[in-house]
Amino acid sequence: MAKLTKRARLIREKVEATKSYDINEAVALLKELATAKFLESVDVAVNLGVDPRKSDQNVRGATVLPHGTGRDVRVAVFTQGANAEAAKEAGAELVGMDELAAQIKAGEMNFDVVIASPDAMRVVGMLGQILGPRGLMPNPKTGTVTPNVAEAVKNAKAGQVRYRNDKNGIIHTTIGKVDFEPAQLKENLEALLGALKKAKPAAAKGVFIKKVSISTTMGAGVAVDQGTLEDAK
């Protein structure tokens, strides 16, 4: 507990809760405060000007970050025939149909992303109660239900992040690791915000990107001045 108390005290001393920081200053603060004994992720929370109670204002999608996320992503693909070979060549760890579904039903879930070709959804659909709660259910909006499974595998491996606003209208995702260069984290964040702006629902009125905060896995959030980000202006 002493270490947690010391870290909490340091955060209080260094981070002004009501201040929005220049992106470079915010990243420098995160790096200074990242004292965990493991390599922490850099996470982002984006408050959107949407009413999540209305289906036409929910935001969901995916984008490939220019510098990836720093994670090794294991991919499972539901497909068959030529698509199965293409998925394997693209780097998918697990490829199959009914036999892959049987593995998942048996509790074997050694993967981070699930991709499916449209003809495989008859099999994947039966796994909704298993994959859905884990956020793994393939969906056309995130590019994980597609006839071009090879491209989807490559995107997942290249550092694609999926996003979906929660019940409070906030997007939570990862933009890298704390050992990334500041410029890499900035460019990843700008790429995410650019994708979010393109995904703005027509029904959403007023300011769309209301607040942007970044944090490490074990750290406090640091608000970012959007004026210092290219794609948030």
From Swiss-Prot:
A GO biological process held by the record: translation
Keyword rRNA-binding: yes
Annotated keywords: Repressor, Ribonucleoprotein, Ribosomal protein, RNA-binding, rRNA-binding, Translation regulation, tRNA-binding
Recorded superkingdom: Bacteria
GO molecular function, one term: rRNA binding
Cellular component per GO, a single term: cytosolic large ribosomal subunit
InterPro entries: Ribosom_uL1_bac-type, Ribosomal_uL1, Ribosomal_uL1-like, Ribosomal_uL1/biogenesis, Ribosomal_uL1_3-a/b-sand, Ribosomal_uL1_CS
Pfam families named in the record: Ribosomal_L1
Family named by the database record: Belongs to the universal ribosomal protein uL1 family.
PANTHER family: 54S RIBOSOMAL PROTEIN L1, MITOCHONDRIAL, LARGE RIBOSOMAL SUBUNIT PROTEIN UL1M
HAMAP family: Ribosomal_uL1_B
Subunit and interaction comment: Part of the 50S ribosomal subunit.
NCBIfam families: rplA_bact
Function per UniProt: Binds directly to 23S rRNA. The L1 stalk is quite mobile in the ribosome, and is involved in E site tRNA release.
Name this protein carries in UniProt: Large ribosomal subunit protein uL1
Source organism of this protein record: Shewanella halifaxensis (strain HAW-EB4)
Gene behind this protein: rplA
